[in-house]
Amino acid sequence: ALADQSYCIGGPEASESCEKLLREYPSIDFLLRGEGEKADLLFFEAAENAGCDLEKIKEAKPLSMSYFLNGKYVETERVPLIENLDDIPFPYTHEELCGLKERILYYEGSRGCPFSCSYCMSSLDKKVRVFSVERVKKDIDEFLSAEVRLVKFVDRTFNFDKKRTYDLLSYIMEKDNGITEFHFEISLWL
């Protein structure tokens, strides 16, 4: 790590063992917990308001963060989960997508998992939250229009809802452009 740099990390794995991670890696200044669409935004707002002064950011105690302040571990209140995933904007412009044609794009049509496997972090959510079928179809249209080579759905269990799965797979087959491929994680016993 560069001594004159500030480090902020996040993500599902980091969100569940915060204090341990911060103790093991003292070069990390902040650990963002929860969904990045909210936690990251809160961090950047706090940083802007504090003039990017690390101590001022910590003193402001922004939500969904873990850090050490004066040698004491601090974990602020976590922001609630995003209930309506359709509120999250599509992350790309058409031009950006066209520039990613030969890349693999990871896409999330749902969050969570219907199972409660003790070894898996996805069991922490306890329920599945979804982007609406209409929203996913609109996003698929964007991928097809840009001729993205491969879209990997990172949904923990894409086929947890048979009707939804049928609707989306039928749509993909109907709109097939002969270029874009789709990848899904499914459970065979559903």
What are these regions (language model features)?
Residues 1-78:
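Glycine-rich beta-alpha loop elements in corrinoid/cobalamin-binding modules
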Residues 11, 19, 62-64, 79-87, ...:
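Generic secondary-structure boundary/loop-capping signal
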Residues 13-15, 36-39, 81-82, 114, ...:
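Short, solvent-exposed loop/turn segments at secondary-structure junctions
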Residues 32, 77-80, 126-128, 157:
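Pocket-edge positions in alpha/beta enzyme catalytic cores
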Residues 34, 67, 78-81, 90, ...:
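Active-site donor-binding loop signature of nucleotide-sugar glycosyltransferases
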Residues 34-37, 82, 103, 130:
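A generic "functional-site adjacency" signal
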Residues 58-60, 81, 100, 177:
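A generic structural signal for short, non-catalytic loop/turn and secondary-structure boundary residues
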Residues 86-190:
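Radical SAM [4Fe-4S] cluster-binding motif and immediate context
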